[in-house]
């Protein structure tokens, strides 16, 4: 792996060259070559600027613990093995991931995605904050250790599953004060939890299946649950079955359907 001690400074990456600038006035910087298929390890926080489309091959980007990083892409894309973010670190991601690949995010730290990606993401651990409408095409959570936090209305997809899929042991979706509608929630088991951590702003979780459907996961926090079918006739087959935990003090609203 290549280890780069940013120490709060700036680094630019173009082709195989990476240049460390000790301060804003340092326009020349210290340059070294980067080998494809090797990880880059950034330490001690700082700013990274992509100046070309980058393909790391089987290499990824590793960020150490307890620091903040700002990644900017100027419209260029990154492609590689994924992103590993250390505990209590936050990576403000203002770059693009390649649309012909899947971004893998691991590590307990936070990926704060500030630009619509046009790609898919798989989350094994840590937080991913969504700040744009339809931030990712599809989101996959597994193992129960990952969390997706909505920071904008409509930041998930617009298909029947809202573009988020909870596989074995799932993970957490934090509505964070934003309403969200599903036709069905793609949750494999009770490892999935949908919550609202915003204690001052109620979030509406609407599940509007028109055929019988079982949600195996959990619902908690400051959530109002609704199951409404837009039909003058009651849909007797539009049964929503909840066999996980539901723990909310807010209303549960059902119209033209069964719960």
Which residues make up each language-model segment?
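Beta-strand-rich extracellular passenger or scaffold domains
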Residues: 1-259
């Amino acid at each position: 792996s290549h280890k780069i001690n940013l120490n709060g400074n700036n680094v630019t990456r173009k082709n195989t060259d990476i240049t460390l600038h000790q301060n804003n006035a340092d326009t020349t910087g210290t340059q070294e070559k980067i080998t494809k298929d090797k990880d880059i390890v950034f330490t001690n926080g700082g700013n990274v600027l992509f100046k070309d489309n980058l393909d790391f091959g089987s290499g990824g980007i590793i960020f150490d613990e307890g620091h903040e990083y700002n990644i900017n892409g100027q419209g260029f894309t990154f492609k590689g093995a994924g992103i590993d973010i250390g505990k209590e670190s936050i990576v403000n991601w203002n770059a693009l991931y390649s649309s012909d690949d899947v971004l893998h995010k691991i590590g307990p730290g936070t990926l704060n995605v500030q630009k619509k990606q046009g790609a898919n993401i798989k989350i094994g651990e840590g937080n991913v904050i969504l700040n744009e409408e339809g931030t990712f095409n599809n989101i996959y959570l597994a193992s129960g250790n990952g969390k997706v936090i909505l920071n904008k209305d409509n930041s998930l997809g617009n298909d029947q599953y809202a573009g988020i899929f909870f596989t074995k042991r799932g993970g957490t979706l934090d509505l964070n004060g934003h309403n969200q509608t599903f036709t069905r929630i793609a949750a494999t088991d009770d490892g999935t939890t949908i919550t609202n951590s915003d204690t001052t702003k109620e979030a509406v979780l609407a599940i509007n299946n028109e055929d019988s459907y079982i949600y195996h996961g959990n619902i908690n926090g400051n959530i109002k649950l609704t199951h409404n079918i837009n039909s003058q006739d009651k849909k007797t087959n539009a049964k929503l079955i909840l066999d996980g935990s539901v723990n909310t003090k807010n209303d549960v609203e059902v119209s033209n359907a069964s719960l």
